[in-house]
């Protein structure tokens, strides 16, 4: 550790050159100020990318648990770019079916907008609802300032089911109307021929 107030916590071939940086594991390179770098046993350098960043290489995947038993949390499988949230039936209780058409109507009324976070540059745009509106519409999650991806995904899937139900109803109505039209066309053709329908 050559950076001011930097630490190499253990492992081998690690460096902490950035001031207030931390390196541990195998070939972890904390080269930026305030950077934290932990590298697994992979035999190649793993370096910080900017000042004040948290950098972890875990080529076997990541697991973050949010309870003492380790039965709740998220995983980032090896080689993946997306977090997997716990959704096991065995981990759930008070399961209640949803009314997909009701959810669809609420999604239709949900204000959506584009925006940027105050902490980010104004050119970095995002799209979606405000957490307060989402909580008021669906009553999901722990508070009205955040939206869980599990809840947003569930609402989207329920709304898609509602659209599917509407589509099926419309398809049935169209089929019935096509039959009525075909019957009327036969009657008109018969009348034009001067015979009884």
Residue ranges and their predicted role:
Residues 127-128, 153:
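Residues that recognize and position ribonucleotide moieties
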Residues 43-49, 87-97, 113-125:
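Active-site-adjacent substrate-recognition loops and nearby beta-strands
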Residues 109, 131-140:
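Glycine-rich, acidic and aromatic/proline-enriched surface loops and short helix-turn segments
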Residues 91, 103-106, 130, 156:
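Stable alpha-helical elements in mature extracytoplasmic
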């Amino acid at each position: 550790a050559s950076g001011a107030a930097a630490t190499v916590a253990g492992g081998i071939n690690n460096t902490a050159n950035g001031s207030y940086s931390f390196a541990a594991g195998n070939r972890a390179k904390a080269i930026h100020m305030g950077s934290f770098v932990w590298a697994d046993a992979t035999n190649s350098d793993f370096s910080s990318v900017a000042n004040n960043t948290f950098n972890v290489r875990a080529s076997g995947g990541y697991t973050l648990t949010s309870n003492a038993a380790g039965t709740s949390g998220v995983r980032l499988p090896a080689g993946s770019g997306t977090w997997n949230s716990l959704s096991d039936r065995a981990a759930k209780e008070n399961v209640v079916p949803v009314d997909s058409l009701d959810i669809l109507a609420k999604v239709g009324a949900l204000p959506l907008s584009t925006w940027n976070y105050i902490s980010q540059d104004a050119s970095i745009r995002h799209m979606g609802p405000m957490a307060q509106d989402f909580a008021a519409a669906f009553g999901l999650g722990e508070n009205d300032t955040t939206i869980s991806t599990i809840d947003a995904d569930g609402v989207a899937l329920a709304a898609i089911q509602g659209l599917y139900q509407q589509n099926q109803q419309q398809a049935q109505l169209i089929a019935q109307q096509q039959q009525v039209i075909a019957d009327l066309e036969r009657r008109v053709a018969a009348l034009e021929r001067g015979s009884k329908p």
